[in-house]
Amino acid sequence: MIHPVRRALAVAASRAPRQFLAAASRTTSVRSVRAAAASGSYYSTTSRRLQDAFPSQLENLASSTLPKVVPQVPQTLTEKIVQRYSVGLAPGKKVKSGDYVTLQPHHCMTHDNSWPVAMKFMSIGASKIHDNRQVVMTLDHDVQNKSEANLKKYRQIEEFANTHGVDFYPAGRGIGHQIMVEEGYAWPGTVTVASDSHSNMYGGVGCLGTPMVRTDAASIWATGKTWWQIPPIAKVTFTGLLPPGVTGKDVIVALCGLFNNDDVLNHAIEFTGAEETMRSIPVDDRLTIANMTTEWGALSGLFPIDAVLASWMRAKATVTAMEHPELGDKAKFTHAKIDALLENPLVADPGATYAKQLYLNLSTLSPFVAGPNSVKIATPLKDLEAQNLKLDKAYLVSCTNSRASDIAAAARVFKDAAADNNGVIPKVAPGVKFYIAAASLLEQKQAEDSGDWQVLLDAGAEPLPSGCGPCIGLGTGLLEPGEIGISASNRNFKGRMGSTDAKAYLASPEVVAASALKGKIAGPGWYQKPEGVEKVIIGEGNGVVEQDKAMSIEDALDKIIAEAESLIANAEAGLTPESTSSSSSSSSSSEEESLTEILPGFPEAISGEIIFCDADNINTDGIYPGKYTYQDNITPAKMAEVCMENYDASFGSIARAGDILVTGFNFGCGSSREQAATAILAKQIPLVVSGSFGNIFSRNSINNALMGVEVPKLVQRLREEFGDKVATRRTGWKLTWDVRRSKVVVEEASGKKWEQKVGELPPNVQEIIARGGLEKWVKSQIEA
C-alpha cells in the first residue's frame, strides 16, 4: 500500500503547475542508496527520430529548423551540455532530443586521418583554420609502419599542424583518445568530438564525446562548426557495488551481451546510480565502459561529474603542480580550474525525459568474455574456462584497457604466480605470444616507475609502440588463420585483428594476462561469487506499479514530473489522448497526398535489381577492411574490388553495377571510416536499403553522396522468401525508390508487387548528394 503522505505528494505534484514542479524538484534532497537488487524501470517516449540531414545553410541551422518560442522543459545531462555548445539558437530555446543543432565543439581531434582531412580542407578552398585552439592532431594508428609513404604522410601532418599552430602529438606519444583525456582536452561538461568512432570514451570524465567523420572535421576546421542531431537519450542506472575481481571491462561486455537487441542503437547514454554505487567505479573503469559504448551501438556514453571524477582530477592537478611548477595557471589541470568546474556542475534535471531506461545490478556481475568475433556474445568466464580453449596470442593494448592501472592488474597476475615459483616471475605459456602497448607514454612511464612494466617484460611479453596497432589490424602480432586470440581492446569483429579465419575474444587485462600465463582462456581466480547471487540482474522499464513502489522518493517525483511535463507539452501543442492515439491513422492519408520537392537534376526515382546480403550488424570492417583504411593512394577500382571483402569474399563477383544493395539491420556499425560508403559507390551501387543503419554510416553516406533508405518490411519479406541463409544473393527482385512520393515499390520474382512508405529525402539532403557530397557542397558555399 502506498503511504498516504506519498500519495498526497504524488497527487499534488501531478496537479501542480510547472513552476511548482520545478521548485519541488530543486528542494528535494533525499539521496536514497539503492538496494543491491535491481529495481524495475519504465519507458518514456520522445519524439520520432528524424532523418539525419545537413541543413542547407550552416549559419541558419537553428533558426531555420527549430521553433522560435518553445516551452521551458527539464533537460538531461546530454541536452544541457549540448545547450552550452550550440550556436544560433532562438532566444529562450532549450534543446531536446531530436533537435538539429549547429555545434561548436570545445575540441576536435583527428589522428592518422589528419592528412586526408587536410586535403578535404584545402580542396574546399579553405586556407586558415577557424580556431587553431579547437583542433588537436595525434598520430597513433599506423605507428609501426616505417614505409616512406607513411612517414611522408606523418611529416605532412606535422608540417600542416605547425603551419596552423595546432597542438600536435607525434607517433609513439600515445593513442589520441588517451591523450585527449590525460591532457585535459576532454574537459567535463564540454562537447569534444573526434574523427574516430571511440570518441565516446571522453564520457568517462563527464565530457560529451561523440564521433564525427572526416568531412565533418574539415568543416569544423574551416568554420568551427558542424551539424548534429541530438539522439534519443538512454539512462542506464547501476545498482549494487562492483565486486572484487570484476572490472569496468566486465560491465561493458555484459551490457553489450545482455542487452544485445540494439537496445541503445544510435542513442546517447547517461550512466547514473547511487553515490555509493558510483564510488565503486573508478575513472579508469569509466573510461573503459564509455569507450565500448561504441560497440554497444551508442553515440556517446556519459558519466556524471561527481566526487569520483573530482578526486581523479585533483590528483592530476597535484602531480602537475609538483612536477611542473613552472606551468602555473597555464597547466591543463589546476585546482582553480577544478574549483570553477565544481562550483556549479551540470546535472540532469529532475523530470528529464529519457527515451529508454535500463538497469544493471553490479553486485551480481562476474567476469565476462566477449566472443568469438562479436561483442554481442558475452559468456561468463567460468563457462569458457571449462572449455579449455587453447590460446595463441594475447594482447594488452588499446585506449580501452592499457592504462597504468590495467598494466598493474596484469602484472599482479604474474606476481601472484611468482609466489608458487620460488619468487621468480613465470614466463607466458609455451606457444603463446603476449603483446603489450601502453595507451600513452605517460601511462607507460607510470607503469615503469611502479615496476609493473618490467614484470610483464620478465614474463616474456613483447612490447609495442604506444598506438593502436593490433587493435585495428596494423603492424606486428596479427592473428593468423586458425589462431585464437584474447585482447583487452574494444573490437573483435571477424578479420579486425588479422585473419578472418581466426577467433578473437575480448576480456579484462587480468583475464588476458592469466590466459597468456596458462595457455588457455582463463582467469586469475580473484573473483568469488557472493552468497545468494545466481544470475546477473538486469531490468528494463515496463511501467509495472510494483516496481514503481521500489523507487526512491526522488525517483518517484522525477517520474511524476516527467509525466506531468508530457501532459503539459501535449496540451500546449493542442493534443489530447484521443488525438495522439489516432494520429497514425489520420496521418497515413495525408502522407499519401504529400509530395517531396525534387531539386532540378535530381532523379525522381531510382531503380535496380536487389542483391541481398542476409546479415545483421554488418560492420565497417566487413564493408571495407581496416588494412586498407590508411592507404590513401588506393584507386576507386581497388576500393570496388575489396568492397565487402571481409563480410563475403564472393561479393565482388556477385554484385553488379547498378544493383541495389539490401542488408539486414544495423548496417554500417563500427568505426567511422568514410571508405565504407565510398567503396560501395566505387562498386557503382547507388542505393543501400537496410532494416536500419548505424548512425555514423548514415552520416558518412550523406556526406559522400551515397543514398540510403530504411525498409524493415523488405528485409523481413526477403527472409521469408529465402529461408536458407546465403551471405550474398541475387534475388531477381526489382526495387524502385520513388523519391517524390517517399515510397519504395518492390516487384518480386513472381511478379507480385507491393509498396511501402519511407522517410522523406528533403531538398537540403538532395542538394548535398547532387553536389557530390558535403565537401563539394561546402566548397560551393565558399565560392558563392
Swiss-Prot record:
Main localization category: mitochondrion
Classification via SUPFAM superfamilies: Aconitase iron-sulfur domain, LeuD/IlvD-like
Localization in the cell: Mitochondrion
Cofactor section: [4Fe-4S] cluster
Residue stretches of biased makeup (Low complexity): 578-589
Molecular-function annotations in GO: 4 iron, 4 sulfur cluster binding; homoaconitate hydratase activity; metal ion binding
Catalytic activity: (2R,3S)-homoisocitrate = cis-homoaconitate + H2O
Keywords: Amino-acid biosynthesis, Iron, Iron-sulfur, Lyase, Lysine biosynthesis, Metal-binding, Mitochondrion, Transit peptide
GO biological process, one term: lysine biosynthetic process via aminoadipic acid
Binding site for [4Fe-4S] cluster: 399, 468, 471
Stretches the record annotates as Disordered: 572-596
GO cellular component term of the entry, any: mitochondrial matrix
Transit peptide start and end: 1-32
Cystine pairs: none
Known pathway: Amino-acid biosynthesis; L-lysine biosynthesis via AAA pathway; L-alpha-aminoadipate from 2-oxoglutarate: step 3/5
Cofactor remark from the record: Binds 1 [4Fe-4S] cluster per subunit.
Highest taxon in the source lineage: Eukaryota
Record CDD domains: Homoaconitase_Swivel (cd01674)
Database matches in InterPro entries: Acnase/IPM_dHydase_lsu_aba_1/3, Acoase/IPM_deHydtase_lsu_aba, Aconitase/3IPM_dehydase_swvl, Aconitase_4Fe-4S_BS, Aconitase_4Fe-4S_dom, AconitaseA/IPMdHydase_ssu_swvl, Homoaconitase_mito, Homoaconitase_swivel
EC numbers for this chain: 4.2.1.36
Family: Belongs to the aconitase/IPM isomerase family.
Function: Catalyzes the reversible hydration of cis-homoaconitate to (2R,3S)-homoisocitrate, a step in the alpha-aminoadipate pathway for lysine biosynthesis.
Protein name, per record: Homoaconitase, mitochondrial
Organism encoding this protein: Neurospora crassa (strain ATCC 24698 / 74-OR23-1A / CBS 708.71 / DSM 1257 / FGSC 987)
Gene: lys-4
